[in-house]
Curated annotation (Swiss-Prot):
Gene3D superfamilies: 1.10.8.60, ClpX chaperone, C4-type zinc finger domain (6.20.220.10), P-loop containing nucleotide triphosphate hydrolases (3.40.50.300). PROSITE patterns: CLPX_ZB. This is ATP-dependent Clp protease ATP-binding subunit ClpX. Component of the ClpX-ClpP complex. Forms a hexameric ring that, in the presence of ATP, binds to fourteen ClpP subunits assembled into a disk-like structure with a central cavity, resembling the structure of eukaryotic proteasomes. It comes from the Bacteria. Residues 1-54 form the ClpX-type ZB domain. Keywords: ATP-binding, Chaperone, Metal-binding, Nucleotide-binding, Zinc. SMART domains: AAA (SM00382), ClpB_D2-small (SM01086), zf-C4_ClpX (SM00994). GO terms for cellular component: HslUV protease complex. Zn(2+) binds at residues 13, 16, 35, 38. GO terms for molecular function: ATP binding; ATP hydrolysis activity; ATP-dependent protein folding chaperone; protein dimerization activity; unfolded protein binding; zinc ion binding. It comes from Frankia alni (strain DSM 45986 / CECT 9034 / ACN14a).
């Protein structure tokens, strides 16, 4: 701060020209001075520009084909789900854009009278097949706030557990408490099949974690102004609330819906009992493909209430991943697992190679475990544990080679010393 005695010359702000007596503080730099008022003004300008740059620019709203191509670079397979999501997300934000611009007179005014309803999305499919990744990738592309909520932790208001408003708090926190930005975000509610009621008939007793949660979610799914406690937890009469309008929040709800395939098969005429029964194992790809024939009545029989189903007009599914898809997941996406582990080893100045039959063995192990793509990382950790323990302490290793035997027989990977690697660098088996 630059202040001088009363007898000296008055210093002035180099930006607004006010003297030191007209402002609270004057901060000195090399040959320049700035007052506290100019600093506040600069902060306001910077914050305004940052908020504008972080908002989704409606003029640059990506087309469905562009959204699909972006999803394709991160998610392997699931073409139908990617196409459905691309169209649904494009239409949703086009609707937000139309709602944000007021209608004019004449023909434009008549068009503005047509109110576009929100289309939330229900995503069905087995675990580890890309449901959460699809939602995360969409939010990353559109640069909108994104929150993931677990439906199993939710209970009806007044009971032990989380209120549904806590879902909205996660979205507000993802937007750095910028409510306006949060109001155009995406919320993914996982494990929604776990809040199904026990039968298709209405319950005569309180079902606080099932049907009660579905009832509590109805309003925020449809669009309402919700009161959210800023610190989470239960609502108290004397605390202040954050008001958020969920009209333009896109909800994607997902779940494995185990057993729903049998309900669909019984409706479309496929036998699930008897000598001619169509039997599916837990990891049979056909068991999830039947989700393509789903109807709202199947979800009703599963235990979802009609009002909840009605607020999820877009229904799509992901299918089980086969061997080829799992190998592609290991190698093709931008953040593929093989690339991640190669990078980890590069940080220790070591090359990591997987033979093609090693990748096939890893994919086969993931199918046997029945955990989909999530099982790939666990298998990779098991396979590479011993070398990840030794390599940081050794400077003589140039390359690590993982073969089929390493995956299936739990032998140690091949370590190639630096002097040997430099002599025969070009001669190696085809590897990833």
């Amino acid at each position: 701060m630059a202040r001088i005695g009363d007898g000296g010359d008055l210093l002035k702000c180099s930006f607004c020209g006010k003297s030191q007596k007209q402002v609270k503080k004057l901060i000195a730099g090399p040959g320049v001075y700035i007052c506290d008022e100019c600093i506040d003004l600069c902060n306001e300008i910077i914050e305004e520009e940052l908020s504008e740059s972080s908002e989704l620019k409606w003029d640059e709203l990506p087309k469905p084909r562009e959204i699909y191509e972006f999803l394709d670079s991160y998610v392997v397979g699931q073409e139908t789900a990617k196409k459905t999501l691309s169209v649904a997300v494009y239409n949703h934000y086009k609707r937000v854009q139309a709602g944000g611009s007021g209608g004019g007179g004449g023909a434009e005014g008549a068009k503005a009278e047509v109110e576009l309803a929100k289309s939330n999305i229900l995503l069905l499919g087995p675990t580890g097949c890309g449901k959460t990744l699809l939602a995360q990738t969409l939010a990353r592309m559109l640069n909108v706030p994104f929150a993931i909520a677990d439906a199993t932790a939710l209970t009806e208001a007044g009971y032990v557990g989380e209120d549904v408003e806590n879902i909205l708090l996660k979205l507000i926190q993802a937007a750095d408490y910028d409510v306006k930005k949060a109001e155009t975000g995406i919320i993914y509610i996982d494990e929604v099949d776990k809040i199904a009621r026990k039968s298709e008939n209405p319950s005569i007793t309180r079902d606080v974690s099932g049907e009660g949660v579905q009832q509590a979610l109805l309003k925020i799914l449809e669009g309402t102004t919700a009161s959210v406690p800023p610190q989470g937890g239960r609502k108290h009469p004397h605390q202040e609330f954050i008001q958020i309008d969920t009209t333009n929040v896109l909800f994607i709800v997902g779940g494995a819906f185990a057993g729903l395939d049998r309900i669909i098969e019984s409706r479309i005429g496929k036998k699930s009992l008897g000598f001619r029964a169509v039997l599916h194992g837990k990891d049979d790809p056909d068991a999830s493909d039947v989700f393509g024939d789903i109807m709202p009545e199947d979800l009703l029989k599963y235990g979802m209430i009609p009002e909840f189903i009605g607020r999820l007009p877009v229904i799509t599914s992901v299918s089980n991943l086969d061997r080829e898809a799992l190998i592609r997941i290991l190698t093709e996406p931008k953040n593929a697992l093989v690339r991640q582990y190669k990078r980890l080893f590069e940080l220790d100045s070591v090359d990591l190679d997987f033979t093609s039959d090693a990748l096939e063995a890893i994919a086969d192990q993931a199918i046997l475990r029945g955990t989909g793509a999530r099982g790939l990382r666990a298998i990779m950790e098991e396979v590479l544990l011993s070398v990840m323990y030794d390599i940081p302490s050794r400077k003589d290793v140039a390359r690590v080679v993982v073969t089929r035997e390493v995956v299936l027989e739990h032998v140690n990977p091949t370590l190639v010393p630096r002097d040997v690697a430099s002599k025969r660098a070009p001669r190696q088996e085809k590897s990833a």
